[in-house]
Structure formats: structure tokens, C-alpha cells
């Protein structure tokens, strides 16, 4: 969508810019800046984070919900493209955003299913059981063999 901000990796238009914890907060920030008259409880938050956006979305804040929906749409649609080629059984959502639970996975699943109706089986969007600790376990496994 004509992304002008550079991603942490140095690229532009990366999925990470929208479909991640930092992406959710970034999208909310952009929405707040785009319409200064639009009401949102997020205007009172000093350090905007994915958690604050997700909490506001759960509480019914429409701007926060738009940010979350946009992030889930990008991720769900990207997964749908992968599903049509690879046909996986499941996708695991981990990291910090996994704490949002089914509030996120149900939205991601809905967007995924919109664009993958021809897949031989429906890939499930699930929560990784290790949550934000997955990286630590992976690093330990590499070191310990």
C-alpha cells in the first residue's frame, strides 16, 4: 500500500510492519495522527504498545479495533497465500501478541478463510503454547543440541 516507512529489516512494505506487536501499535499511531478529531482512548496513553491497543480494542475503542483488524487482515491474507501453495495443517501464533488469545486468532482465521476457499483443507490458526518464550527455548535447543 505504498509504504514509505522503513521496516526494521531495512525493507519497505514488509508484513512485519503490520502483522506484529510493533505493527499493531504502529498502525494505531498512524490512525491517531491521520485524524486528530477522531475520538480514541488511546490518545491518553503515553507509551502506545500492542497491549494498550489490544486492551482498548477489547473495550470497544473503534480506532484501536481498526488497527487490530488491519493487522489481522494482513496476516490472514498472507497466510491464505501460503495455504494455497503449501497447504499446511496449522499456523502457530507466538510471541507477545499471542497473549491476546482468541481475540486475535479468530480474526486472523476469518481473513485467512476468506481467501483460501479452494484449499484442500482449512489450515487452523492456533496459539503457540510457549508464547513469548519460544525464542528462549529455541536458542537453548541450538546451544544444547
Task: Kindly give the residue locations of the regions a language model identified.
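ATP-binding/phosphotransfer module of carbohydrate and carboxylate kinases, centering on a glycine-rich
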Residues: 2-145
Amino acid at each position: 500500500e505504498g509504504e514509505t516507512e522503513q521496516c526494521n529489516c531495512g525493507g519497505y512494505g514488509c508484513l512485519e510492519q503490520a502483522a506484529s506487536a510493533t505493527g499493531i501499535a504502529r498502525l494505531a499511531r498512524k490512525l491517531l495522527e491521520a485524524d486528530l478529531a477522531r475520538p480514541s482512548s488511546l490518545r491518553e496513553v503515553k507509551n502506545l504498545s500492542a497491549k494498550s491497543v489490544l486492551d482498548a480494542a477489547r473495550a470497544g475503542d473503534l480506532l484501536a479495533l481498526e488497527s487490530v483488524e488491519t493487522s489481522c487482515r494482513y496476516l490472514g491474507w498472507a497466510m491464505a497465500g501460503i495455504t494455497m501453495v503449501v497447504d499446511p495443517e496449522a499456523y502457530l501464533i507466538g510471541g507477545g501478541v499471542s497473549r491476546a488469545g482468541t481475540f486475535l486468532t479468530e480474526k486472523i482465521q476469518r481473513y485467512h478463510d476468506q481467501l483460501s476457499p479452494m484449499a484442500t483443507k482449512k489450515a487452523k490458526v492456533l496459539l503457540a503454547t510457549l508464547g513469548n518464550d519460544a525464542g528462549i527455548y529455541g536458542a537453548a535447543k541450538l546451544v544444547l543440541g
